A protein has these predicted regions:
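Bacterial N-terminal signal peptides
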Residues: 11-24
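N-terminal secretory signal peptides that target proteins for export/translocation
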Residues: 1-9
Length: 121
């Protein structure tokens, strides 16, 4: 190979590596962990208003009954937006309660990949 060809390949490789690094940094920045606050409810009553369904005597009982009886999922409602939650088992523990969820949001599916969930103060 000629030195001109080697130089071209070297610059091409450097350019590709730089592009890959930039793409990785952008992806990481858009998918960083965030804290979301709201109420654990179900996607049958996504605004956490259980007055219409009343499948239980409390919001917790109603939320769990809807998930168990209607094949729906636990979601987080923050007062404006409803988010699907990746950890349905942890969500069950906090059904009908206000929580703080730390996780990564997939903005195409509105699903939070849950890292942790605790009762809100």
């Amino acid at each position: 190979m000629t030195s001109l060809c080697l130089s071209f390949m070297k610059y091409l490789l450097i350019g590709l590596l730089a592009s890959a690094l930039l793409a990785s940094a952008t992806m990481f920045a858009t998918q960083s962990r965030q804290t979301f606050s709201g109420t654990i409810t179900d996607d049958e009553c996504p605004s956490a208003d259980h007055s219409g369904m009343r499948m239980g005597s409390t919001d917790t009982a109603c939320t769990i009954a809807c998930v168990d009886d209607h094949t729906v999922e636990f979601v987080l409602f923050d007062g404006e937006q409803t988010y699907l939650l990746s950890d349905q088992d942890k969500s069950r523990e906090f059904a009908g309660k206000k929580v703080a969820v730390v996780g990564t949001l997939d903005s195409t599916t509105w699903t939070i990949q849950v890292n942790s969930m605790v009762a809100a103060n």
